[in-house]
């Protein structure tokens, strides 16, 4: 075993600089918090807990802008996951997490453990996970390494979720060269619980037991939290040891054991928390801090699968499928019997103490004795300097880009073959979307929808993020992300309830990057306030750059909504011929950052038009009322590719075409003005629908035949649905074939 440095050697050689702890922070810990030099183990604990991934020291100042309260919110940010009341004593529990850095270096395990970690966050609240979603952003598919990364990532997501018996019901997948060296992998999990069973990550009550349950501890993932708080260079393949290894079968056992405990014997329990980033130190210190308690742990008692592990390694290991419990004194054996039944370790490794110190013993020696709050609450915040990106200033001085479309049919077909637009079926078929048979709507539609068993209710869920728009204007782009998510929820006939987020950005020490972070949060916060969708959980992933080149700022918004009656669930496919087609929302010249701009120019540039959030909220509510009255046959949110893509996708489900005649130009057919919907309405409800939506809906045609017959202001086209669908379905399989 390697000889650890002495406190004096640490001060002299500064190994903490490689663990994302700055010299200023180290000196502050020595001089202000401990009044002595920390030893090797203590220094490692501070480095992990003070990393951006655990502490949000860079981003905390802007995260405070988020609205987090509302009449349905039972638990906001700060716990394992957010909890939202859906009535009848039930709640929906959800959270999203990023696993970008691990996925970049070991994509299968990086993605798999991303799913595993977010599932544990949900069942640590006492909820049974019922669904997962993802948000994936990769480089262009002409690169062999990118194709490998994508295949392995999808396999990792599917492999873990399928083994757990939890359906993957939705998500998004986009492609842009900016993500080539640093893909974005965000996972979201949704669970359901009876409100009476809700748990918290809390440790208090002198003498109560700290119990370690689940898999044994190994050396995988050590310093994973600090790894996620660093930028990449082109040699990041060497960092695979920081990636955890998952075992979904072990997690399935852990899930069932934990739910048996929380649902049948909650009176034995004080608190429960997942061992995620920074492993034992994070879960234990956070639980003690939340309980305003002290804690003493004996690391010799921690179940270990490798010999000779140091205290440093035991505390910072991020081995998967582990939970930490605070159990009332006298019930330790009762809890152990539950976990014994599932053949899982369940060991008392410490006790709650009366003081406020965090004490660790290893091989009979005290290897850590520090105030609990020094790890969790005394972190030095580091807001960065800010500067508006120069490209925004330059673009604002230029005339807006106007596309020229000379051949509508050709452009339409090219659009459907774009990787971001094309069918993702070859990837989503990897996922089991129907396991446990609660899935009503699976991948490929605006929202995934699951029934709430024993009721007529459903839960709609979606993930949305478009880095191009955030890059062009972070604040407006942030608003658009929330509006897009709300549009997906509304299109299913659901009421938007709340959001979770993953904030994926570059190096926050760059003033332009921090400006993007700050202003995107401003935009998301504003939209959440207006649309009444508070932020209940989330995650920040910074330092997403390779060799100094940042990804697009890519916040992901995960939204959950309530379908009050599944009889009025709305799908995105045209249902019958002869229904009237309406375009809801006004169409503007919104081409900056659009799929059309990328396709025709190969670049992204320009300025975004702002949104009237109050107006959008108003007609969204009127549209939802029409859906709940049973007046809407189908609805599809308009996003990438605009009305053109939504028309095509709505026709693919049942092969029903449309005859469209409207005042839009060929270019406007591809405009990406946010907040719009394509709605089909049975003729008997058409007049009532038109009256309710008034000037916010215009009739553009009818469903009919087996082709899209378009008569626009400047061009016309007759496009067979079968031909369009073939292009759309075959594009990605063709691109994924080796070109080497």
Swiss-Prot record:
Lineage: Bacteria, Bacillati, Bacillota, Bacilli, Lactobacillales
Active site: 53, 99 (proton acceptor)
Statement: the UniProt record of this protein carries the keyword Ligase: yes
One BP annotation, GO: 'de novo' IMP biosynthetic process
The organism of origin for this protein: Lactobacillus delbrueckii subsp. bulgaricus (strain ATCC 11842 / DSM 20081 / BCRC 10696 / JCM 1002 / NBRC 13953 / NCIMB 11778 / NCTC 12712 / WDCM 00102 / Lb 14)
The keyword Protein transport is annotated on this UniProt entry: no
Main location: cytoplasm
Entries under Pfam families matching the protein: AIRS (PF00586), AIRS_C (PF02769), FGAR-AT_linker (PF18072)
Subunit structure: Monomer. Part of the FGAM synthase complex composed of 1 PurL, 1 PurQ and 2 PurS subunits.
Binding positions (Mg(2+) 2): 121, 274
A GO MF term: ATP binding
Role noted for this protein: Part of the phosphoribosylformylglycinamidine synthase complex involved in the purines biosynthetic pathway. Catalyzes the ATP-dependent conversion of formylglycinamide ribonucleotide (FGAR) and glutamine to yield formylglycinamidine ribonucleotide (FGAM) and glutamate. The FGAM synthase complex is composed of three subunits. PurQ produces an ammonia molecule by converting glutamine to glutamate. PurL transfers the ammonia molecule to FGAR to form FGAM in an ATP-dependent manner.
Full protein name: Phosphoribosylformylglycinamidine synthase subunit PurL
């Amino acid at each position: 075993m390697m000889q650890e440095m002495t406190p004096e050697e640490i001060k002299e050689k500064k190994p903490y600089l490689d663990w994302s702890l700055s010299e200023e922070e180290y000196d502050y810990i020595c001089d202000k918090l401990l009044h002595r030099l920390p030893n090797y183990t203590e220094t490692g604990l501070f480095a992990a807990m003070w990393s951006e991934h655990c502490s949000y020291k860079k981003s905390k100042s802007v995260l405070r802008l988020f609205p987090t309260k509302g009449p349905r919110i039972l638990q906001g940010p700060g716990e394992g996951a957010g909890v939202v009341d859906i009535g009848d004593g039930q709640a929906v529990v959800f959270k999203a997490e990023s696993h970008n850095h691990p996925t970049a270096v070991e994509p299968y395990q990086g993605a798999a453990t991303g799913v595993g970690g977010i599932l544990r966050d949900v069942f640590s609240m006492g909820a049974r996970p019922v669904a997962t979603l993802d948000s994936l952003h990769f480089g262009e598919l002409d690169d062999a390494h990118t194709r490998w990364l994508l295949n392995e990532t999808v396999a990792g997501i599917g492999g873990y979720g399928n083994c757990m018996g939890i359906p993957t019901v939705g998500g998004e997948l986009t492609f842009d060269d900016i993500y080539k060296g640093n893909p974005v992998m965000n996972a979201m999990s949704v669970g359901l619980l009876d409100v009476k069973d809700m748990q918290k990550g809390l440790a208090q009550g002198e003498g109560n037991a700290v119990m370690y349950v689940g898999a044994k501890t190994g050396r995988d993932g050590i310093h994973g939290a600090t790894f996620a708080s660093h930028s990449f260079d082109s040699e990041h393949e060497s960092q695979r040891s920081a990636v955890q290894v998952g075992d979904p079968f072990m997690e399935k056992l852990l899930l069932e054991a934990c739910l048996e405990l929380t649902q049948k014997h909650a009176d034995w329990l004080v608190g429960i928390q997942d061992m995620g980033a920074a492993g034992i130190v994070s879960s234990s210190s956070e639980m003690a801090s939340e309980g305003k308690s002290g804690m003493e742990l004996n690391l010799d008692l921690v179940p270990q699968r490798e010999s000779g592990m140091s205290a440093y390694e035991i505390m910072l290991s991020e081995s998967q499928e582990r939970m930490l419990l605070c159990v009332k004194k006298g019930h330790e054996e009762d809890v152990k019997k539950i976990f014994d039944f599932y053949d899982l370790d369940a060991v008392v490794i410490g006790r709650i103490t009366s003081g406020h110190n965090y004490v660790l013993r290893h091989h009979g020696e005290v290897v850590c004795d520090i105030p609990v709050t020094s790890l969790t609450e005394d972190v030095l915040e580091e807001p960065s300097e800010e500067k508006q990106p120069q490209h925004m200033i330059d673009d604002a001085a230029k005339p807006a880009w106007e596309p020229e479309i000379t051949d509508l049919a050709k452009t339409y077909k090219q659009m459907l073959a774009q990787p971001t637009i094309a069918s993702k079926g070859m990837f989503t078929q990897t996922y089991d979307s129907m396991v446990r048979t609660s899935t009503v709507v699976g991948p490929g539609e605006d929202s995934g929808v699951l029934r709430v068993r024993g009721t007529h209710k459903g839960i709609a869920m979606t993930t949305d993020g478009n880095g191009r728009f955030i890059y062009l204007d972070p604040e407006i782009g942030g608003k658009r992300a929330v509006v897009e998510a709300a549009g997906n929820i509304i299109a299913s006939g659901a009421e938007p309830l709340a959001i979770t987020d993953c904030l994926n950005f570059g190096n926050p020490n760059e003033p332009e990057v921090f400006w993007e972070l700050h202003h995107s949060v401003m935009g998301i916060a504003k939209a959440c306030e207006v649309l009444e969708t508070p932020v209940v959980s989330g995650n920040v992933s910074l330092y997403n750059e390779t060799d100094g080149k940042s990804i697009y700022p890519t916040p992901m918004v995960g939204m959950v909504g309530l379908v009050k009656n599944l009889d009025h669930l709305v799908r995105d496919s045209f249902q019958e011929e002869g229904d009237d087609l309406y375009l809801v929302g006004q169409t503007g010249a919104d081409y900056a950052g659009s799929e059309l701009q990328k396709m025709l120019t190969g670049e992204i540039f320009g300025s975004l038009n702002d949104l009237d959030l109050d107006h959008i909220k108003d007609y969204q509510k009127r549209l939802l009322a029409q859906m709940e009255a049973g007046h809407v046959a189908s609805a599809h949110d308009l996003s990438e590719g605009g009305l053109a893509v939504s028309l095509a996708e709505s026709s693919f489900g049942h092969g029903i075409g449309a005859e469209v005649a409207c005042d839009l130009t060929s270019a406007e057919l591809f405009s990406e003005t946010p907040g719009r919907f394509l709605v089909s309405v049975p003729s008997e409800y058409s007049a009532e629908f038109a009256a309710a939506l008034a000037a916010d809906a215009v009739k553009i045609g009818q469903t009919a035949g087996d082709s899209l017959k378009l008569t626009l202001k400047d061009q016309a086209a007759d496009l067979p649905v079968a031909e369009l669908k073939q292009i759309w379905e075959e594009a990605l399989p063709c691109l994924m074939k080796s070109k080497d």
